[in-house]
């Protein structure tokens, strides 16, 4: 290539004019120790708590321990190929996850990356994983019901939008089943559901996703999965990531339901991380801030004020107990953070009462305001009558003669217990719950044999749907049982009862 001498001078002049003196500075550090998913890094002077740190091989870490001479980082990926002496860089960003409508119907990991084989999540919006909870002024009181479709819960332990209701019980007592039924019951109610699986078996998560897909619930559900094979840092991040995804919809004025399954495994993952970071252990070897770990997560559930759009985030955290011991560290912590608890007992479960809700020690501290008036009218005495029945049942085991009133109460109690039984994946619309509870509480079932109650319930709904279709509509419209509606209900139940008893 021949360049003329006069061209050379113009090229040099051009280069000098376009010469860029910008210097790019990168905050970097050196790994001085690595192992067990923890890296100690020297030289990151102005690092933030919770900042993303870039490691070799496209692996990111999170700065958790800011010490005088080094920074303790947890790795959010595989540590293979990363060794002492490697250079790491600051990103000057905290951990964030993708949010938006594109996530609905997807299964993602703790960092929002898809793991369902359906291609990338097409969204440009992200949100920090750790966000401060809304303040007192930004909230309004819980006053709208969130129906679970489970008779025992909607009647005695009602949940409102924006509430945090703990589901607590031993393993294999139906905790996840209650959460799943609640998700299924939100179909067609414009509620976004998020199921966060923490430390579960991969087969269990696959089974849940399969069931949700089969029932058509994945159309409004996001599944965030951090299974038992994931590292402790990823399990630790999962609920915060799910919460951020839910907050996006809450700030858009929508109602969101989020299930954390379960926070016991979350605390164990955090304990693992803390001990590896050499933080001092406390009770049951958990670190001192394990209460704050869960309180800052659950406080993010709220019903926002109308000024902020009036959206809500309702949380159903799940905690597993050992041999029914609710006085252990994590259960007592979460009980004191939440607005009530649904306590499930293995004795009731094994006795065939499913859902195995112990109505005696289960409470809802704020949901009563959210209950519709019609449900309050039928369920007002339910808890008391069940408690009296249990007491009488225990007393009658001694074989002593009971007076007529006590026998009547026992018979009514047996039917109430039978009515509160419900199969899994069978959530019930609120108007049907009210109809059958009205029948049970007002002694309409006293002459129906206990073993025929389930059959009676099923056929009663069919009868009312055929002959008294307007009853359900009236309940939903007025949200209370007027005298006219009560007499209509009494007539419908008595008409059907005469037909039913004549066929037995």
UniProtKB/Swiss-Prot annotation:
- One function term, GO molecular function aspect: proton-transporting ATP synthase activity, rotational mechanism
User: Any idea which positions bind ATP?
Assistant: 169-176
The record's subcellular locations are: Cell membrane
Fetch the InterPro entries from UniProt: ATP_synth_asu-like_sf (IPR023366), ATP_synth_asu_C (IPR000793), ATP_synth_asu_C_sf (IPR038376), ATP_synth_F1_a_nt-bd_dom (IPR033732), ATP_synth_F1_asu (IPR005294), ATPase_a/bsu_AS (IPR020003), ATPase_F1/V1/A1_a/bsu_N (IPR004100), ATPase_F1/V1/A1_a/bsu_N_sf (IPR036121)
Show the Pfam families listed in the entry: ATP-synt_ab (PF00006), ATP-synt_ab_C (PF00306), ATP-synt_ab_N (PF02874)
**Key word Lipid metabolism present:** no
What SUPFAM superfamilies does the record tag this protein with?
C-terminal domain of alpha and beta subunits of F1 ATP synthase, N-terminal domain of alpha and beta subunits of F1 ATP synthase, P-loop containing nucleoside triphosphate hydrolases
Instruction: Offer a single GO CC term for the protein.
Output: proton-transporting ATP synthase complex
This protein's membrane topology, according to the annotation, is: Peripheral membrane protein
| Site feature (Required for activity) residues | 362
Q: Which keywords accompany this UniProt record?
A: ATP synthesis, ATP-binding, Cell membrane, CF(1), Hydrogen ion transport, Ion transport, Membrane, Nucleotide-binding, Translocase, Transport
Family matches, as CDD domains: ATP-synt_F1_alpha_C, ATP-synt_F1_alpha_N, F1-ATPase_alpha_CD
Catalysed reaction equations from the record: ATP + H2O + 4 H(+)(in) = ADP + phosphate + 5 H(+)(out)
As recorded in UniProt, its EC number(s) are 7.1.2.2
Primary role: Produces ATP from ADP in the presence of a proton gradient across the membrane. The alpha chain is a regulatory subunit.
Q: How does it assemble?
A: F-type ATPases have 2 components, CF(1) - the catalytic core - and CF(0) - the membrane proton channel. CF(1) has five subunits: alpha(3), beta(3), gamma(1), delta(1), epsilon(1). CF(0) has three main subunits: a(1), b(2) and c(9-12). The alpha and beta chains form an alternating ring which encloses part of the gamma chain. CF(1) is attached to CF(0) by a central stalk formed by the gamma and epsilon chains, while a peripheral stalk is formed by the delta and b chains.
Q: Member of which family? A: Belongs to the ATPase alpha/beta chains family.
* Name of the protein: ATP synthase subunit alpha
Source lineage: Bacteria, Bacillati, Bacillota, Clostridia, Eubacteriales
